[in-house]
């Protein structure tokens, strides 16, 4: 089984769809492959765990469920900006 690490390009709010997700795939001999995915039509389930952030679950078209943990969420008083619009 191959190991895949996940990280968000930027934090998202509850109820928002992410614009994109970086997938970091570790291969043989410590070779790292970065994969860029834009899950615009993915189903999402969000659960908040107290004091630790949020866990996001995406169901991609390949029918593979991907789960990762967001350690840092945007503070409520911080202004939201989108660099892609």
UniProtKB/Swiss-Prot annotation:
Major localization listed first in the record, in broad terms: plastid
Keywords, in A-Z order: Chloroplast, Plastid
Top-level taxon of the source organism: Eukaryota
Subcellular location: Plastid, Chloroplast
GO cellular component, one term: chloroplast
Family listed: Belongs to the ycf76 family.
Protein name: Uncharacterized protein ycf76
Source organism of the structure: Saccharum officinarum (Sugarcane)
């Amino acid at each position: 089984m191959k190991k895949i690490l996940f990280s968000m390009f930027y934090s998202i709010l509850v109820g928002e769809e992410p614009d994109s997700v970086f997938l970091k795939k570790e291969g043989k001999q410590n070779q790292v492959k970065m994969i860029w995915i834009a899950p615009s039509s993915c189903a999402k389930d969000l659960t908040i765990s107290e004091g630790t952030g949020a866990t996001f679950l995406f169901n991609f078209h390949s029918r593979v469920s991907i789960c990762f943990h967001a350690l840092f969420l945007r503070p409520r008083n911080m202004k939201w900006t989108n660099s892609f619009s």
